Regions:
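Hydrophobic faces of well-ordered beta-strands that scaffold small-molecule active sites
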Residues: 14-20, 58-63, 96-98, 124-128, ...
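Charged helix-capping and loop-helix junction motifs
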Residues: 1, 37-45, 74-84, 181-184
Length: 218
């Protein structure tokens, strides 16, 4: 929130999201039983929905499940907690950013099923760190593609609806990871100039879809 204020001071409009990261649930399970760990995690989600209700933030993220292998009981618990989190997000009309394993058509179908069970609108559910596998058949979920040349060209050629991201970490130990903060505007403009994406696609990627997902940039 402090960083968003600095961005506004610099003239930017910002949409802020917050939530406990799904890996935090895994860490809680090291110290608590599944019921206790879930309750603590969902209490944090509830706090974040309060921020949305108070117009401090516009959505929840990153919610989801671990991107690494866990045992079946833990996996089932993570999916159950994700479903409950989506129900809570829907109550305050929040968008949700998902952190999950690598997206494939099968993964996207499973995430869409969880969203349906929570009665959460899939169009406002964003698969973060998306790639070709997640956008080939997104099952109605919005995909935020990592802004690589390959991803941009593939999505534009097939006219797939998407947003772009860098997953920039701002970690001094990993400078520029995953992609630098200037990557999206730089590659978007280059792709537009070279005819890789059309003006209509450019507008959808950077204006129409973000405005639909986040509703308000302050």
């Amino acid at each position: 929130l402090k960083l968003s204020e600095k961005a506004r001071e610099a003239g930017a409009k910002v949409a802020v999201i917050s939530s406990p990261h799904p890996v935090q649930l895994i860490k809680l399970l090291e110290h608590y039983n599944p019921e206790e760990a879930s309750e603590i995690y969902l209490d944090a989600v509830d706090f974040c929905t309060t921020l949305v209700n108070e117009k401090v933030t516009v959505g929840l993220g990153e919610l989801g499940r671990p991107h690494f292998e866990v045992d079946q009981k833990t996996w089932d618990l993570c999916n159950q907690v994700l479903k409950e989190s989506l129900k809570m997000a829907k109550e305050v009309d929040a968008s949700v950013i998902l952190h999950t394993e690598t997206g494939t058509p099968e993964v996207m179908a499973d995430l869409a099923s969880i969203s349906n069970k929570a009665n959460f609108p899939k169009s406002r559910l964003v698969k973060h760190y998306g790639g070709i596998g997640s956008i080939e058949n997104s099952h109605g979920i919005t995909v935020s593609l990592l802004a690589s040349n390959e991803n941009i060209a593939f999505a534009s050629k097939n006219n797939f609806s998407h947003m772009l991201e860098t997953d920039y970490l701002d970690d001094p130990k990993r400078p520029g990871a995953v992609l630098g903060p200037k990557t999206v505007p730089r590659k978007s403009l280059k792709s537009l100039q070279e005819g890789v994406i059309s003006e209509e696609q450019f507008s959808k990627i950077h204006t129409d879809i973000p405005n639909f997902i986040y509703k308000e940039f302050i």
